[in-house]
Amino acid sequence: MKNILDKIFFRFNNLDHISQNIKALSKNTPVKKIFDAINFYSSDSEIRFVGGCVRKIINNENVDDIDLATNLEPEEVCKALKKNNIKYYETGLDHGTITSLIDNYKFEITTLREDVLTDGRHAKVKFSRDWKKDASRRDFTINCIYSDRDGNLFDPYEGKKDLEAGYINFIGDPDKRIKEDYLRILRYLRFFLNYSKQTHSQEIISKLKINIDGISKLSKERLLDELKKIFKLKTLEKLSQDQKSKDLIKLIFPELKNISVFSKLDTNKKKELKNNDFIFFLSLMIIDGTDNSDYFLYKFNISNQNKKRIKIIDNFFKNKLGSNTFSEKKMNKIFYYEGKQAVIDILNFKMIKSKKFDQNLFELLTLYRNKLKPKMPIGADILMTKFQIPEGKQLGLKLKMIEEEWVNNDFQISEQQVKNIINI
């Protein structure tokens, strides 16, 4: 009878590494406290792992975020946590999400939901006690797999099967699911690049393109956040190799002109690229010698600090590059005036874009990663006391001239050189 019931409810019992890793997750994190708090709240209360953490365990990936689903309403979740002295925040109460913090671990606990109204950006929901209905509102089959803490799966749309076969399938009608939240266009691309072992379904690609204008309804922050996740993928190289994926992302981000760069990386370049962040990846994509990067920065909400970082790279490569452009002397100037990050970005940019591995660039990168910014040995106090230069415009001018000479001379300057500048 139990086997029949398990089949009816789409359950899979103790599936090898899955159950072992789920149990390990319960053992190695404080999530057990949350399971106990919810499961013992009432006779029918229940909580399960859901979404990314289950997907990653099935796929033998490291789990970073732990999401949980429960049939308790948010107020009941708060009562259960409070009763067990578990710290929590009502971060998304309207959408049924409570965030719990235990020993520096963060857990998001979300009540089962049904969509009442969607507008392409957000959903108005009502709370539910129906696990199947909660699953049916999710985007892809691989994201609606639930598990109890013993590794027993609830998988109503056969997400495990799709994950193992490398299919990225929407739950239900793709057109309907996309119109509920247009961010799913980018999410589809991210999951395809990361998990697909198949070619794109022509039906899905067609529906994605038909709905592409809906992207304009989304905030720039949500779009950039999803782009960051794509750039973090270990399978990013696939983006430049798969024409349909490349065409799709260019419809959303037309300023990403240099996607093909990821298909031409040797082992050294791939290793170097791993050490870089989203802003550097973005620079590689949008800097092309035109005003393309300016337009992207105008459209999207990039911090002033990161805008400056991209502009330093852009301006550097808009200048004519000579045989001594990447000399230590030239790099020292950038290092002193713009900072370590600017030098590393410029050297990395050149190395990734170069057709062949350049040992000089590699050695310069190693040098500047470990180099501390030097401090000019001559200050205003010395000029005033030793050389009797009064405070004022002349003092500032001489100090700047000395600084320029010191930087141009690889951060060295003699007393005679200082005297020569003062006597000009």
Go through each PLM region and give its residues.
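Catalytic cores of the polymerase beta-like nucleotidyltransferase superfamily
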Residues: 1-424
